[in-house]
Regions:
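Compositionally biased intrinsically disordered regions enriched in Thr/Gly
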Residues: 19-169, 175-285
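Bacterial Sec-dependent N-terminal signal peptides
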Residues: 1-29
């Protein structure tokens, strides 16, 4: 499954968030909670055979004096975590349906192949290793203030093979418009070339090297170009670009995080970003 971003343009105004799990109680009294699942199901219902394991930790808006606001946020979160077809469901129903589908797909897809392999092969242990599946989707609200909410989704999956795959996605939501915040909303004009240069310089500093070639010799920018991407988050120190495995470096190097300080990117920031960064830095003090 690919974790997708759904752009929701919702008519909502006049609500303000505070840090933590509860927003301004005098406004919409919005609170967040989570639903956990840890489900293991074996092929043919036989505990001696391989199994799939699904772990979910889904963060959602649990309460609000404005029901439409709560439902709109949850539709956004559900779509981002599980897919568009779940966005109209309640969080409880969506998690239940997603779990049922994962288990059903696992058994329907693999039981016929496993049965055939059992008939053709003698070594059951070598068969089982390739049929043990795993998926984890865990989300939480990473940042919340009067202007922005950052929702983080950590995803990992194993479907046989040498290793699994994992990724983290960050959704930055403008709380005044309830729409995603993109780089184009934060930087002035043609910012990409200058921002790319800053990313290279910071990555060199992080790795104690002085040239791009040295970074490439280490493995960076060998699986993809190092450039600004929409997978980023903001905190009191600056903006962090998060490159998942394979995006700019081999799997063995893991994910790459590059943080640019607000001071370094100040010449590129537009007015909205200046206000936003000031609020985030104030909250972090």
């Amino acid at each position: 499954q690919t974790v997708s971003l759904l752009v929701l343009l919702l008519a909502a105004s006049g609500f303000f968030f505070s840090c933590g799990n509860t927003v301004n109680k005098n406004a919409y009294a919005l609170e967040f909670d989570s639903i956990q699942v840890n489900e293991t199901v074996h092929l043919f219902g036989d505990t001696a055979k391989p199994a799939c394991n699904l772990i979910l930790n889904f963060a959602y808006a649990s309460q609000s004096s404005d029901v439409r606001l709560k439902d709109s946020l949850n539709a956004f979160f559900l779509s981002a975590c599980f897919g568009d077809k779940y966005m109209a469901m309640t969080p409880e129903e969506a998690v239940k349906k997603y779990t049922e589908k994962y288990v059903s797909d696992y058994r329907n897809d693999l039981e016929p192949m496993y049965k055939k392999d059992e008939e053709d092969k003698q070594d059951e242990q070598s068969i089982g290793a390739w049929y043990s599946y795993y998926k984890g989707i865990e989300s939480h609200v990473q940042l919340c203030n009067t202007l922005i909410l950052t929702y983080r989704i950590d995803y990992n999956e194993y479907t046989g093979g040498a290793h699994g795959i994992y990724m983290s996605t960050f959704l930055n939501l403008d709380l005044k418009t309830l729409s995603p915040i993109h780089l184009g909303d934060l930087f002035e004009g043609d910012y990409k070339e200058a921002l790319t240069d800053l990313l290279w310089k910071q990555l060199m500093a992080d790795n104690n090297v002085s040239t791009r070639q040295e970074l490439e010799d280490m493995g960076y920018a060998t699986t993809g170009d190092l450039e600004p991407i929409e997978n980023f988050y903001l905190d009191p120190t600056g903006i962090t670009f998060y490159y998942n495995v394979y995006e700019i470096a081999p799997y063995v190097m893991g994910a790459t995080k590059i943080t640019l300080s607000y001071e370094d990117i100040a010449p590129l920031m537009n007015g909205k970003f200046i206000v936003l960064s000031s609020a985030i830095k104030t909250d972090g003090e």
